[in-house]
């Protein structure tokens, strides 16, 4: 199958998650909504159910969710609730609500109340002190709770061997996505930012084994291509999410390719594998423990600005000329971190721009002007 045909299939999935959900339900699969961030999807998969990512929507308007949410909740969380309320997600058999930020914590309770007569909500509280033994034990207790709730929905026990098998499936998927990110940069004349986003976004709505098989086929086609002749500029993207095709078209129109990303919706979600050698449940706990350089996670060495330096090094090592930060409106962790990230980028001499984004935005005129000007600056350096 050609690159164009494979990408077209991924794009169709990314553009129509509701249709994808219906297809799995029609096939007899139970589906569990998975909100951001770092939920152990492997447990859902091990139960024989389909994990279904919930990252807001670029096409819906917040209406009914306003009854539950303060105005300063980020639109990703509000739109997840909106889709649960307006029937978009009626086919779900349950939803996992992680609580890793100040918006998701109360939102988990809003969803629990709003969905009390509709579907079970599985509360998940990750430990911020995740390195110490007590943090690992807390995480294990939480994952055991999630496992128990999933068993109620599935109607059967989730066995250790099934979790181990799920970990292998997910590790293969993570490896394939990491490879794709590199190949997309190497062949940015073929994989533009819109296509790159669609391929990665589709992973949230597909069976991981099916997704990985298709992605491996795409990677093989990309490897066979000659070296790219790229006359534009390359950047690293950073933020929570940047999947709006209208905004990404601005990158394409200005010959801006994405060399790598530090995006929660993209590479942050598949940086860290789970061990295939240890106890499967502990492997998932240690996977979370080993997750690092994330603005949403506590860093006991934050005074060293490790994350800022990590992002700066990513720009250098990827061959990018600058960084574009997508600042999600009302995202406290990102807003609080920005001065430290700016300090690291300035110290490394890396040009960057910060764009305020929101899933309710429909006019990207200001962002387009900023990106065009930034591309012009980078092109003459």
Regions found by a protein language model. Name each.
Residues 11-25, 33-42, 61-66, 74-78:
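Metallocofactor- and cofactor-centric catalytic cores in central/energy metabolism, strongly enriched
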Residues 60-69, 131-135, 267-274, 363-366:
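Short, charged, surface-exposed secondary-structure boundary motifs
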């Amino acid at each position: 199958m050609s690159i164009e045909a494979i990408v077209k299939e991924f794009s169709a999935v990314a553009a129509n998650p509701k249709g994808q959900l219906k297809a799995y339900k029609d096939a007899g699969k139970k589906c569990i909504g998975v909100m951001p961030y770092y939920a152990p999807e492997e447990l859902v998969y091990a139960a024989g159910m389909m994990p279904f990512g919930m990252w807001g929507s670029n096409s819906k308007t917040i209406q009914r969710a306003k009854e539950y949410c303060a105005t300063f909740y980020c639109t990703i969380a509000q739109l997840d609730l909106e889709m649960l309320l307006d029937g978009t997600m009626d086919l779900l058999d349950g939803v996992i609500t992680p609580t890793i930020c100040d918006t998701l914590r109360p939102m988990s309770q809003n969803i629990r109340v709003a969905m009390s007569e509709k579907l079970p909500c599985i509360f998940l509280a990750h430990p911020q002190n995740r390195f110490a033994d007590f943090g690992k034990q807390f995480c294990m207790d939480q994952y055991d709770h999630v496992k128990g709730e999933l068993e109620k929905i599935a109607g059967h026990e989730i066995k250790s061997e099934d979790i181990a098998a799920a970990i292998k499936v997910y590790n293969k998927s993570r490896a394939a996505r990491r490879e794709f990110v590199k190949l997309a940069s190497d062949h940015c004349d073929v994989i533009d930012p819109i296509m790159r986003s669609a391929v990665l976004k589709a992973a949230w709505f597909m069976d991981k084994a099916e997704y990985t098989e298709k992605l491996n086929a795409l990677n093989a086609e990309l490897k066979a291509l000659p070296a790219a002749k790229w006359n534009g500029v390359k950047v690293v993207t950073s933020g929570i999410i940047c999947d709006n095709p209208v905004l990404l078209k601005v990158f394409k129109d200005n010959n801006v390719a994405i060399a790598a990303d530090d995006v929660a919706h993209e590479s942050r979600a598949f940086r860290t594998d789970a061990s295939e050698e240890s106890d499967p449940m502990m492997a998932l706990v240690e996977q979370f423990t080993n997750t690092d350089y994330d603005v949403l996670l506590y860093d006991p060495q934050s005074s060293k600005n490790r994350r800022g330096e990590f992002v700066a090094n990513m720009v250098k090592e990827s061959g990018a000329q600058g960084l574009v930060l997508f600042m999600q409106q009302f995202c406290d962790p990102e807003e609080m971190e920005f001065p430290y990230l700016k300090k690291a980028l300035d110290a490394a001499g890396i040009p960057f721009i910060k764009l305020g984004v929101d899933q309710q935005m429909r006019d990207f005129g200001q962002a387009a002007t900023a990106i065009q000007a930034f591309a012009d600056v980078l092109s003459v350096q």
